[in-house]
Regions:
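N-terminal capping segment at the start of a domain
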Residues: 16, 20-47, 59, 102-103, ...
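Structural recognition of the beta-strand scaffold that forms the well-ordered cores
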Residues: 65, 83, 94-98, 140-143, ...
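Acidic/histidine-rich catalytic neighborhood of metal-dependent amide-processing enzymes
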Residues: 78, 105-209, 213-217, 222-225, ...
């Protein structure tokens, strides 16, 4: 399909509006203001999950919280994921969009970009899906706890929320067409990459949609591998892709620091990121 033809089809399909971007930004702001810190598998993390549940529900979406225990290097901890499902047709396949909300433990980190930005983005997407339901494909949004590792990624350290989500989706026997993991996409100087550890066809899909939306200058394919919430899906055979901006501040110096604050992210970047994700969902519905 040509870029021009895809552009025309996407223009008539599911869209992400400026109002959705505004909600995304204000939601991120609320998370940072009231839920910092929100370290993985902690009572503060559960406070954040409850607030996310309330914010998603306020869009009119049918949201639920899944609380579970998982092992960590510091023993068993209680984690909390939040889900919202938008079923267009029981026989249609599913697109899963996932973002973590937790912050890195052991440091003072507001996590405005790393966690809150795409948490807000998914709330904006929930609002869009309630307001403008998409046809021909079902969408599941997942806000995960436990993406961040306590020490370093390894067995029982990090990705607990996405590992749990994979198990739930397998138990439901959902026909998943694509998993899109979004992370750190609020950066005012947005430069998103698609890491090498992703499904090739989905990577090309994201690049094609970015081109059709005039976003090629801020979305590119990378040779690096990134450990993120898409990895457990890949490990279980689901087609998955990660969209992440891993150049946050000079030499990524704002990442996992007290400098990860709201003044570093923008509504405009969330609008571009939301438009890209909505475009990919629409393109998958057209296929």
């Amino acid at each position: 399909m040509s870029t021009k033809m895809l552009s025309l089809l996407l223009a008539a399909a599911f869209s992400f509006t400026r109002a959705d971007a505004s909600l995304s930004y204000s939601s991120a702001e609320e998370i940072v203001k009231y839920c910092t810190p929100r370290d993985a598998g902690t009572p503060r993390g559960e406070i954040a999950a409850n607030r996310i549940l309330d914010m998603v529900s306020s869009t009119g979406a049918d949201a639920r919280k899944d609380s579970f225990f998982a092992r960590t290097p510091l023993g068993r901890r209680r984690f909390n994921n939040v889900y919202a499902e938008f079923e267009a047709n029981p026989t249609s396949s599913w697109v899963v969009v996932v973002s973590h909300f937790d912050t890195k433990s052991g440091i003072v980190c507001p996590g405005a970009n790393d966690g809150a930005s795409t948490t807000g983005l998914l709330i904006g997407l929930a609002n869009a899906l309630v307001d403008r339901p998409i046809k021909n494909i079902n969408v599941m949004l997942i806000w995960t706890d436990g993406e961040e590792s306590l020490y370093s990624y390894g067995e029982n350290d990090g990705l607990q929320g996405s590992i749990r989500a994979v198990s739930n989706i397998e138990a439901l026997k959902r026909n998943v067409k694509a998993v899109i993991c979004v992370d750190m996409l609020g950066d005012k100087d947005l430069n998103a990459i698609i890491p090498a550890n992703g499904t090739k066809e989905l990577t090309e899909k994201v690049l094609s949609v970015a081109a059709s939306l005039g976003l090629s200058s801020i979305v590119s394919k990378s040779n690096v591998h990134v450990k993120d919430d898409h990895q457990p899906f890949l490990d279980r055979g689901f087609p998955a892709v990660n969209i992440i901006d891993f150049s946050y501040g000079p030499k990524n110096s704002w990442w996992h620091t007290s400098s990860d604050t709201m003044d570093k992210i923008s509504e405009e970047s969330l609008f571009k990121a939301g438009s890209l994700v909505a475009g990919v969902i629409s393109s998958l519905a057209i296929d």
